[in-house]
UniProtKB/Swiss-Prot annotation:
Pathway: Amine and polyamine biosynthesis; S-adenosylmethioninamine biosynthesis; S-adenosylmethioninamine from S-adenosyl-L-methionine: step 1/1. It is an enzyme of class 4 (lyase). Belongs to the prokaryotic AdoMetDC family. Type 1 subfamily. This is S-adenosylmethionine decarboxylase proenzyme. One of its GO terms (biological process) is spermidine biosynthetic process. InterPro entries: AdoMetDC_C (IPR042286), AdoMetDC_fam_prok (IPR003826), AdoMetDC_N (IPR042284), S-AdoMet_deCO2ase_core (IPR016067), S-AdoMet_deCOase_pro-enz (IPR017716). The lineage of its organism: Archaea, Thermoproteota, Thermoprotei, Thermoproteales, Thermoproteaceae. Its cofactor is pyruvate. Is synthesized initially as an inactive proenzyme. Formation of the active enzyme involves a self-maturation process in which the active site pyruvoyl group is generated from an internal serine residue via an autocatalytic post-translational modification. Two non-identical subunits are generated from the proenzyme in this reaction, and the pyruvate is formed at the N-terminus of the alpha chain, which is derived from the carboxyl end of the proenzyme. One of its GO terms (molecular function) is adenosylmethionine decarboxylase activity. The gene is speH. Binds 1 pyruvoyl group covalently per subunit.
Length: 125
């Protein structure tokens, strides 16, 4: 049942957001974003399985992602607008997706953040 009715049998937490007014230089820095996403994985207490990235043109934005045993973490950037989106979804009581999200935000240094939370758990009556 949705909305947390009954006992939670599967734990899924999803925090995602829009970051405005980020430094375009860091949004173009593939190496820095990979380092940030690896550290965010540790902070979330998730098990890193793989990291990947894709650059959209020589000076364009990036998609950087971590596949973790518990789900995924991703950063998508639009440096020409100083804009990024961040997505952290983890399963399990042992993970802390908000801490990972907050860490990424601290590194991208946006002027404005819109954050959203989704409970993706399963509940049993």
């Amino acid at each position: 049942m949705a909305g947390g009715v009954g006992a939670r049998v599967v734990v899924g937490r999803h925090i995602y957001g829009n970051l405005y007014g980020c430094d375009p230089q860091i949004l173009r820095d593939e190496s820095a974003l990979i380092t940030i996403i690896k550290e965010a994985t540790k902070i979330a207490n998730a098990m890193l399985l793989s990291v990947g990235s894709y650059r959209f043109g020589p000076n364009g934005g990036l998609t950087v992602f971590a596949i973790v045993a518990e789900s995924h973490i991703s950063i998508h950037t639009w440096p020409e607008y100083g804009f990024a989106t961040v997505d952290v979804y983890t399963c399990g009581d042992h993970t802390d997706p908000k801490a990972a999200f907050d860490y990424i935000v601290s590194k991208l240094k946006p002027q404005k953040v819109e954050a959203f939370f989704g409970d993706r758990s399963m509940y049993k009556e």
